[in-house]
């Protein structure tokens, strides 16, 4: 497993590092809490 960073879609802040299987072709999207936005927002995997 490889850890990938997640960026907030609203502010672009890099908040989380989550494990992901290396063979997966799709990008990860999760709804997580962003402390900078002070709300739950969509976070997408970044390179």
UniProtKB/Swiss-Prot annotation:
GO biological process, one term: translation
A GO molecular function held by the record: structural constituent of ribosome
PROSITE patterns per record: RIBOSOMAL_L33
Pfam families: Ribosomal_L33
One cellular component term from this protein's GO annotations in UniProt: cytoplasm
Stored SUPFAM superfamilies: Zn-binding ribosomal proteins (SSF57829)
InterPro entries the UniProt entry points to: Ribosomal_bL33, Ribosomal_bL33_CS, Ribosomal_bL33_sf, Ribosomal_zn-bd
Protein family per UniProt: Belongs to the bacterial ribosomal protein bL33 family.
Protein name: Large ribosomal subunit protein bL33
Provenance organism: Staphylococcus capitis
């Amino acid at each position: 497993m490889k850890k990938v960073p997640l960026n907030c879609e609203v502010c672009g802040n890099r908040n989380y590092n989550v494990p992901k299987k290396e063979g997966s072709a799709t990008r990860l999207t999760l709804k997580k809490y962003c402390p900078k936005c002070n709300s739950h927002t969509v976070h997408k995997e970044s390179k």
